[in-house]
A protein has these predicted regions:
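Short, low-complexity N-terminal intrinsically disordered segments enriched in polar/charged residues
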Residues: 23-79
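Amphipathic alpha-helical coiled-coil segments
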Residues: 83-84
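Surface-exposed, charged secondary-structure patches
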Residues: 87-158
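Bacterial N-terminal signal peptides that target proteins for export
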Residues: 1-9
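Short beta-strand edge/turn micro-motifs at domain boundaries
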Residues: 144-152, 156, 161-195
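Conserved aromatic-histidine-acidic binding/catalytic patches
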Residues: 31-34, 38, 139, 143, ...
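Bacterial N-terminal signal peptides
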Residues: 10-17
Length: 195
């Protein structure tokens, strides 16, 4: 078996073929490249889902918000491929990382005694919670590597009571077999505040 290296079009990393002739190779790698516009659309959709989950919870509690959040997680995240590297903002200790969809669902809407979450998507923290009514991503970096991409920036959220928050976000995306972007890395934290 002969190992040959081919660099198709603008891809810098080598593609290895076993056997065959490199002249006959017709890699279709570039058609799978995730575009910046797709990443922006995915982040806009994530923000829209956050506001929708919050609204559903305001209107019908967990009975409405939990099924919606579950559907959002199934559609937007890549848990069907295996563990997702998800580090939410409002977590700590042994339940900081949410590699399962059950952990993600608890983080977004609460109601799972295994995680003891208050539900980030429901609204502002504390006892006098206010639902999220606006969410806008501000992306600083998009890196695209064929069928995967990374994005880093802020998400600005606003509650019905007028309170605002900015969260640092890093998302890693994988294109699935149907062409949809799936979140496989999601790191979230609050910006550093000096004393």
């Amino acid at each position: 078996m002969v190992l040959k290296s081919v660099v198709p079009l603008a891809i810098a990393a080598p593609v290895f073929l076993f056997g065959g002739n490199a002249v006959d190779a017709k890699p279709a790698l570039m058609s799978d490249t995730i575009e910046a516009s797709e990443v922006k659309a995915a982040q806009d959709a994530w923000c829209g889902a956050l506001v929708s989950i919050s609204k559903a919870h305001t209107e019908g509690g967990l009975a409405m918000s939990k099924p919606l959040a579950s559907g959002v997680i199934d559609a937007a995240y890549g848990y069907q491929f295996g563990p997702v590297a998800f580090k939410p903002t409002w977590t700590k200790g042994s339940t900081t990382f949410r590699e399962t969809s059950a952990g993600a669902l608890s983080y977004f809407v609460g109601g799972d005694p295994a995680f003891k979450d208050s539900g980030f998507a429901i609204g502002t923290p504390g006892s006098n919670r206010s639902p999220w009514v606006k969410c806008k991503p501000e992306i600083f970096v998009i890196q695209s590597f064929g069928s995967t991409a990374n994005a880093m920036g802020w998400v600005h959220i606003e509650a019905a009571d007028g309170s605002k928050s900015t969260v640092d976000k890093t998302f890693g995306y994988l294109r699935d077999d149907n062409g949809n972007l799936r979140i496989v890395v999601h790191h979230s934290s609050t910006p550093f505040v000096s004393n």
